C-alpha cells in the first residue's frame, strides 16, 4: 500500500481517502516504491520524476496512472511538511519577537533611567552654577575689602626727590648755622642794628615741601630805622622772618608789626638781595626768562641750566659784563612769574658747588662794570633819577620794575662775605680802575642833571623814595664788611677822577639811554655774593686769615667814612607824607620822627 494509515506527516487525516488512493495505485499496476522513494524529497524533484515517467512512451498507461496517484499523495505529504516547518518557523519567530519585546522593554527602562539621570545632572549643574556665581560675587566683595584694607594700611611714602631735598636741606642747615656763627663774630663790630633773618627753616616737621601762598605786595614802612646810607628810595614789601629764628622776642615783635599776612602753611623761602638794574637790563631779563620757562617744564631745571651757564662764564672773564645783571634779573623775575620760587631757591642752594664758580665769574664781570661806570652812593642817587626819567618814557617797564622789586623784597637774605673774598674783590676793582682811568670821567655832573628830573615829577620821586626804603632794608641785612671793603677799594681811584667831562656825560645820557645798563656793579656783585656764599664760607672757615687781610680790615672804616663824606657834598632833600630825607646825612626818617635820628646820634 502506498499511504500508511495513522501517518500524520502524510497530510491525510481520513482513512477513506487514504484507502481509495491506495486502491487506485494497486489497480493500475503500481506499487508503494515510487511513494517511498520520493517521500522525503521536495516537490520539485517529485514533479520532475513524474514528468519523466509520463513522457516515456515505453511506460504503460496503467503504470503512469499508478505513479500519478503516488505523486498526488506525496504532494499532500510535502504540503504537510512545509506547514510544519512554517509552524516551527513561526514559533521561532514568535520567540524572537518575544525576545525582542523583552529587550525593548529593557531598553525603555534603561532609557528612562538615563533620562532621570540626565535630569538630575542638569539640576545639579544648575545648582552648581548658582553656587559658583554666589562664590564669585563673594570673592569680589572680599577682594574689594582686602584692597581697601591694604590701602588704609599702606604708609605714606615720600617721593625720592623730596627725600633727597630733605636730606640736602638738613645738611645745608648744619653748614649754614656753622657759617653764620663763624661770620657773626667778625661782622658784629660793623653792624649797629642787624635784623637776624636766616635763609631757611631748620627742623621741618614734614618731608613734604609745602607751597607758599602768594604774598600780598604792598608798600610798607619798616618799623626799625636802619643805619645804612642810601640816597635812593625803593618801594618794597618787608621780608617775612621766622619768629623761631629771631635773636630776641623784642626783635621778632618789632618785625611782625610791619609784615603782611602769610598763610600758616607757607614756608619761608630762600632770600634774595634787591639789585637795582637799569630798565633796559630788566626788560632783557624778562625777555630771557619767558622762553626759558616755555622750554623747561620745571623751573628747577632752569636754575640747573643757569648754574651750568654761569660755570661756563668763568673762563670768559670780563668780556661779558652784562651776564651778571641778566643772571640776577632772571632769578628775580622767576619769583614774579612763578610763586614757587622758594622751592627753586632751595634747590639752587643745594648746588652751591656749581654756584661758587658762577660767583667767581660774577666778580670778574662786576669789576669790569666798575671799570666802565664807577659810581658811589651819589652815583646811585643819579641812577635813581635816571630811572625816574626813563619811567616817564616807558611807564610799562617802570611798573614791571616796581612789581619786580616788590617780589624780590620777599626773598631778601641775611648773609656775609669772608675777608678773603673782600680782599680779592678790592684788589680786582683797584687794578681795573688803574687800567682804565679814562672811563672814570663819566659821572661827575650826573647828579645835577638828574636832580632836575626829580623836581619835574614829584610822583615818580615819591615812588623812588619808597623804593629806596626797600634797598636800605635789603642792604642793611647784608653785612657791612662787604660794602665797606668795596667802597674802600674804589674810593682811592675816585679821588683821582677828573671833573671836566660832566657836560659830555649829560649829552651822552640824552643820546644813549642804554648807557646805564651796567650802572650798578656793586649791587650786582653784592647780590650774587649774598646769593651763593655758602661753599666759599665752608671751604675757608678753617683757614687762617693772612696778616694783609687783618690790616685791610683795620683800614676799612676810615676809608669808608672819607668816601662817604665826599659823596655827601650835594645832598638831596625831599619830604613826603610818609617819610623825609635828612639833607646832611641823606638818611630816610619816618614821618613821626621830629629830627634825624642819625645826626642826633652822631652829634650825641
Swiss-Prot record:
Compositionally skewed regions (Polar residues) per UniProt: 322-333
The entry's keywords: RNA-binding, Transcription, Transcription regulation
Signal peptide: none
Region feature Disordered, mapped onto this chain: 314-337, 374-397, 485-523, 538-580
Segments traversing the membrane: none
Ranges of compositional bias, category Basic and acidic residues: 544-572
Disulfide bridge partners, by residue number: none
InterPro entries, per database record: TEX13A-D_N (IPR028193)
Keyword Kinase: no
Task performed by this protein: Plays a role in transcriptional repression.
Family from the record: Belongs to the TEX13 family.
Name of the protein this chain belongs to: Testis-expressed protein 13C-1
Gene giving rise to this polypeptide: Tex13c1
Amino acid at each position: 500500500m502506498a499511504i500508511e494509515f495513522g501517518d500524520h506527516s502524510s497530510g491525510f487525516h481520513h482513512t477513506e481517502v487514504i484507502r481509495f488512493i491506495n486502491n487506485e495505485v494497486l489497480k493500475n499496476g503500481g506499487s508503494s516504491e515510487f511513494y517511498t522513494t520520493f517521500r522525503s524529497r521536495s516537490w520539485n524533484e517529485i514533479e520532475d520524476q513524474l514528468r519523466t515517467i509520463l513522457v516515456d512512451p515505453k511506460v504503460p498507461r496503467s503504470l503512469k496512472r499508478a505513479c500519478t496517484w503516488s505523486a498526488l499523495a506525496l504532494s499532500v505529504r510535502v504540503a504537510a511538511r512545509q506547514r510544519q516547518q512554517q509552524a516551527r518557523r513561526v514559533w521561532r519567530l514568535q520567540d524572537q519577537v518575544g525576545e525582542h519585546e523583552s529587550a525593548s522593554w529593557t531598553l525603555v527602562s534603561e532609557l528612562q533611567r538615563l533620562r532621570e539621570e540626565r535630569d538630575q545632572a542638569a539640576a545639579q549643574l544648575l545648582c552648581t552654577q548658582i553656587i559658583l556665581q554666589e562664590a564669585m560675587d563673594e570673592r569680589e566683595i572680599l577682594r574689594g575689602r582686602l584692597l581697601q584694607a591694604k590701602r588704609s594700611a599702606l604708609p605714606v611714602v615720600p617721593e625720592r626727590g623730596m627725600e633727597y631735598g630733605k636730606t640736602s636741606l638738613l645738611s645745608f642747615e648744619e653748614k649754614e648755622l656753622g657759617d653764620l656763627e663763624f661770620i657773626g663774630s667778625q661782622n658784629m663790630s660793623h653792624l649797629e642794628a642787624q635784623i637776624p633773618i636766616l635763609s631757611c627753616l631748620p627742623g621741618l616737621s614734614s618731608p613734604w615741601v609745602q607751597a607758599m601762598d602768594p604774598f600780598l605786595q604792598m608798600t610798607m614802612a619798616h618799623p626799625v630805622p636802619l643805619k645804612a646810607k642810601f640816597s635812593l628810595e625803593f618801594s618794597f614789601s618787608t621780608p617775612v622772618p621766622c619768629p623761631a629764628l629771631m635773636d630776641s622776642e623784642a626783635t621778632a615783635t618789632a618785625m611782625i608789626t610791619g609784615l603782611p599776612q602769610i598763610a600758616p602753611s607757607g614756608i619761608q623761602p630762600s632770600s634774595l638781595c634787591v639789585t637795582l638794574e637799569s630798565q633796559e637790563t630788566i626788560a632783557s631779563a624778562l625777555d630771557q626768562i619767558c622762553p626759558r620757562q616755555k622750554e623747561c617744564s620745571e623751573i628747577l631745571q632752569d636754575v640747573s641750566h643757569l648754574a651750568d651757564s654761569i660755570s661756563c662764564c668763568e673762563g670768559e672773564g670780563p668780556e661779558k659784563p652784562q651776564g651778571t645783571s641778566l643772571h640776577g634779573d632772571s632769578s628775580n623775575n622767576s619769583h614774579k612769574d612763578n610763586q614757587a620760587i622758594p622751592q627753586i631757591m632751595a634747590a639752587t642752594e643745594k648746588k652751591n658747588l656749581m654756584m661758587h664758580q658762577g660767583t667767581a665769574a660774577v666778580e670778574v664781570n662786576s669789576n669790569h662794570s666798575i671799570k666802565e661806570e664807577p659810581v658811589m652812593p651819589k652815583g646811585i642817587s643819579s641812577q635813581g633819577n635816571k630811572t625816574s626819567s626813563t619811567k616817564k618814557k616807558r611807564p610799562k617797564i617802570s611798573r614791571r620794575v616796581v612789581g619786580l622789586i616788590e617780589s624780590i623784597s620777599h626773598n631778601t637774605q641775611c648773609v656775609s662775605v669772608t675777608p678773603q673774598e673782600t680782599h680779592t674783590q678790592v684788589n680786582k676793582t683797584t687794578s681795573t680802575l688803574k687800567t682804565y682811568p679814562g672811563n672814570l670821567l663819566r659821572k661827575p655832573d650826573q647828579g645835577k642833571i638828574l636832580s632836575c628830573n626829580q623836581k619835574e615829577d614829584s610822583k615818580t620821586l615819591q615812588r623812588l623814595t619808597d623804593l629806596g626804603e626797600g634797598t636800605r632794608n635789603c642792604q642793611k641785612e647784608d653785612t657791612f664788611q662787604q660794602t665797606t671793603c668795596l667802597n674802600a677799594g674804589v674810593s682811592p681811584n675816585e679821588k683821582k677822577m677828573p671833573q671836566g667831562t660832566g657836560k659830555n656825560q649829560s649829552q651822552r645820557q640824552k643820546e644813549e639811554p642804554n648807557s646805564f645798563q651796567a650802572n650798578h656793579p656793586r649791587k650786582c656783585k653784592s647780590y650774587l655774593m649774598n646769593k651763593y656764599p655758602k661753599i666759599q664760607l665752608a671751604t675757608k672757615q678753617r683757614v687762617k686769615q693772612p696778616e694783609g687781610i687783618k690790616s685791610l680790615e683795620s683800614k676799612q672804616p676810615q676809608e669808608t667814612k672819607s668816601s662817604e663824606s665826599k659823596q655827601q657834598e650835594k645832598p638831596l632833600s625831599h619830604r613826603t607824607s610818609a617819610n623825609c630825607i635828612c639833607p646832611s646825612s641823606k638818611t630816610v626818617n619816618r614821618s613821626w620822627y621830629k629830627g634825624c635820628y642819625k645826626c642826633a646820634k652822631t652829634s650825641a
